[in-house]
């Protein structure tokens, strides 16, 4: 999905969700089919939303077919992980995660920081400052980012400029990139999906010394969700950046994340929070399938 960036200024000026709590049910179905069957598979699912100060998980469950041994734990980044193993021959693996969450937009009461203030948090948030190949900006973007930083009085002002720059350049177009595509490759293509837009945004922020992290989750596609109506939702990605507090922004849609966004995982990039990852034993090929259904309950 894409929106229209509404000029310059503070990110808080851009659209966010309503102040009323919204309750959403998310049903995420994913898995693999195996052309010649699999003898066994070992997997991790990151499909359970997090409870935070802005989001409460009321109910959640993860179901695996064929029936599998499983355990739940939290990884280094605080994400809920369901690890499971299937030790019998199977032609397909299906994972269904169903969750009900209630959320409100994140309220930031802390004053924005100055450029000089970033040094004080560089050690604490050093992992979110790394310019690895996944997020490193394209070489052609360097001069633009240098000019933007030089003209920005504060990190927050620079961040707003980055959001507009990335949103204007990267067209949302599925099929142009792959899960392994880097931010620089997507930038050169001029198009990609939410993962690519988030990675490009992270790289531009980190290059200026602003801690920034990748966020994965779900998005209800309607600006005004109808209570009781089930719609095709989206696995989605956005960013959070440090400006006195962690502030979120969805650069694909040019909005501040609100009550239509359901947060599942945070990390340095997509590689820290893939919905489903694992290994399997088969002589043939496999094919991934995914569907997301979202229902507003109230």
Q: What positions do the PLM features span?
A:
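Intrinsically disordered, low-complexity N-terminal segments that are enriched in acidic
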Residues: 1-113
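Hydrophobic/aromatic-rich core segments of domains that either
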Residues: 11, 16, 164, 196-286
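Structural beta-strand/beta-sheet cores of well-ordered domains, especially the beta-sheet scaffolds
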Residues: 22, 28, 43, 60, ...
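Ser/Thr-centric signal marking residues that sit
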Residues: 30, 177, 252
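Short intrinsically disordered coil segments
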Residues: 45-47, 62, 110-120, 253-256, ...
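Structured loops at beta-to-helix junctions and adjacent beta-edge loops in soluble globular domains
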Residues: 48-50, 65, 98-100, 242, ...
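Glycine-centered loop/turn motifs
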Residues: 98, 138, 152, 228-229
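Secondary-structure boundary elements
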Residues: 109-111, 117-192, 200, 208, ...
């Amino acid at each position: 999905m894409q929106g229209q960036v509404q000029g310059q200024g503070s990110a808080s000026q851009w659209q966010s969700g309503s102040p009323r709590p919204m309750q959403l049910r998310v049903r995420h179905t994913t898995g693999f089919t195996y052309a010649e069957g699999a003898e066994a598979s070992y997997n991790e699912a990151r499909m359970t939303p997090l409870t935070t100060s802005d989001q409460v998980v009321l109910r959640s469950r993860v179901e695996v077919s064929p029936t599998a041994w499983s355990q739940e734990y939290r990884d280094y980044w605080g994400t809920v992980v369901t690890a499971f193993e299937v030790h019998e021959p199977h032609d397909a693996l299906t994972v269904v995660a169903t969750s009900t969450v209630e959320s409100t937009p994140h309220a930031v009461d802390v004053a924005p920081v100055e450029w000089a203030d970033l040094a004080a948090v560089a050690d604490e948030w050093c992992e979110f400052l790394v310019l690895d190949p996944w997020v490193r900006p394209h070489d052609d973007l360097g001069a633009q980012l240098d000019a933007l930083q030089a003209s920005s009085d504060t990190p927050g002002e620079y961040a707003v400029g980055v959001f507009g720059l990335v949103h204007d350049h990267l067209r949302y177009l599925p099929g142009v990139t792959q899960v392994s595509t880097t931010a620089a490759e997507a930038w050169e293509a001029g198009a990609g999906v939410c993962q690519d837009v988030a990675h490009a945004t992270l790289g531009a922020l980190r290059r200026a010394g602003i801690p920034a992290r990748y966020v994965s989750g779900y998005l209800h596609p309607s600006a005004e969700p109808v209570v009781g109506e089930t719609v095709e939702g989206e696995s989605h990605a956005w960013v959070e950046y440090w400006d006195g507090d962690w502030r979120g922004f969805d650069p694909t849609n040019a909005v501040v994340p609100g009550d239509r966004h359901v947060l599942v995982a945070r990390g340095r990039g997509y590689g820290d929070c893939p919905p489903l990852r694992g290994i399997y034993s088969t002589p043939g090929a496999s094919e991934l399938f995914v569907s997301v259904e979202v229902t507003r309950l109230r």
